[in-house]
Design a protein with these regions (language model features):
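Conserved phosphate-binding catalytic cores of ATP/NTP-utilizing and phosphoryl-transfer enzymes
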Residues: 110-141, 262-273
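N-terminal amphipathic/basic-hydrophobic helices that include classical n-h-c signal peptides
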Residues: 1-27
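Short beta-strand-loop/turn "lid" adjacent to the catalytic site in phosphate-handling enzymes
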Residues: 71-122, 156-170, 200-211, 215, ...
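Long hydrophobic alpha-helical segments typical of transmembrane helices together
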Residues: 229-273
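Gly/Thr-rich phosphate-binding beta-strand-loop-beta motif of the actin/hexokinase/Hsp70
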Residues: 28-47, 132, 138-161, 177
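N-terminal glycine/serine-rich phosphate-binding loop of ATP-dependent small-molecule kinases
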Residues: 17-109
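Active-site rim beta-loop-alpha module in soluble metabolic enzymes
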Residues: 167-228
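Short, structured loop/turn "capping" segments at alpha-beta junctions
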Residues: 139-144, 162, 183-192
Length: 273
């Protein structure tokens, strides 16, 4: 009897240990860090789903935010930064996470990089390409990021990143007209909802010339890529994607999470290497 009771206790202990591992495995999350020049975007992914997405000021705020989570809830982190000394400034992550990945242009990616100068390729464009492969793994994909610049990046159905194009963004175009002329005013980016494309004031002419023309430009670029690549899927993201997605007539997938989704896809890919 004693032996049977002892065996039952061992089995019960094993069961609870197994249950603890299973539960914790399901709740463990990836920490995604995208550091730009003026702010840091962070996201938490659980089983490839974004659970939290927010913008913070600096790494000190990040450290405070991470105190809300218990040991074991976070399993890995990826850091993509355009600022120097990222590994030094985020070194505290090594004390609370078993795996921290710092990305650079030569890091392994879930696609073949055909770019002629890979060392000059921004981490953001690599992450967008990875997101394209993640969302449409067997398709030709054009990823458009409408931010400070408007970038166009294409990944083939064979998972080959070819490159794309870089154009001035909306804010850059508005500032350029002011800075390179003597009389045109400085106009800030705004939610331009005027459907009338013929401006009747200098300001409305400038706004129409930027906002309406950007829509037509993107439509034209999509058309060019569709001529080259059959069954093309189009992803739109970036700070201005909310305005653009309502006006672009081509079928697109639009989301503000594309870049962090790409970073999470890269992290998951490198775990398997």
């Amino acid at each position: 009897v004693a032996q049977r009771e002892g065996g039952a206790i061992v089995i019960l202990k094993f069961f609870w240990k197994f249950l603890y591992i299973v539960v914790n495995e399901k709740t463990m999350m990836n920490l995604i860090i995208d550091e730009g020049n003026s702010s840091i975007k962070i996201a938490l992914f659980e089983e490839n789903r974004c659970k939290i997405f927010k913008k913070i000021e600096n790494e000190t705020v990040l450290a405070q935010f991470l105190q809300e989570f218990s040991l074991g809830e976070l399993k890995a982190a990826v850091v993509a930064s355009v600022v120097k000394d990222a590994e030094q400034r985020f070194s505290f992550l090594n004390n609370i996470l078993p795996e921290v990945l710092y990305l650079n242009a030569l890091s392994p990616m879930p696609f073949v990089n055909k770019y002629a100068t890979p060392q000059t390729l921004g981490i953001d464009r690599l992450a967008l390409a990875a997101a394209g492969v993640h969302h449409f793994p067997n398709c030709n994909v054009l990823i458009i990021d409408a931010g400070t610049c408007i970038t166009f990046d294409v990944v083939t159905k064979n998972k080959e990143y070819l490159g794309g194009a870089i154009a001035p963004g909306i804010g850059m175009r508005l500032r350029a007209m002011h800075e390179f002329t003597s009389k045109l005013p400085l106009i800030e980016e705004q939610d331009y909802d005027n459907e009338e494309f013929i401006g009747n004031t200098t300001q409305s002419c400038m706004l129409s010339g930027v906002y309406c023309n950007v829509v037509q430009e993107i439509e034209g670029v999509i058309g060019l890529y569709k001529q080259r690549f059959q069954d093309l899927e189009v992803i739109l993201t970036g700070g201005n994607h909310f305005y653009l997605q309502k006006r672009i007539k081509s079928r697109i997938f639009a989301s503000s999470l594309v870049l962090v989704e790409g970073l999470n896809a890269i992290l998951e890919y490198q775990k398997q290497l």
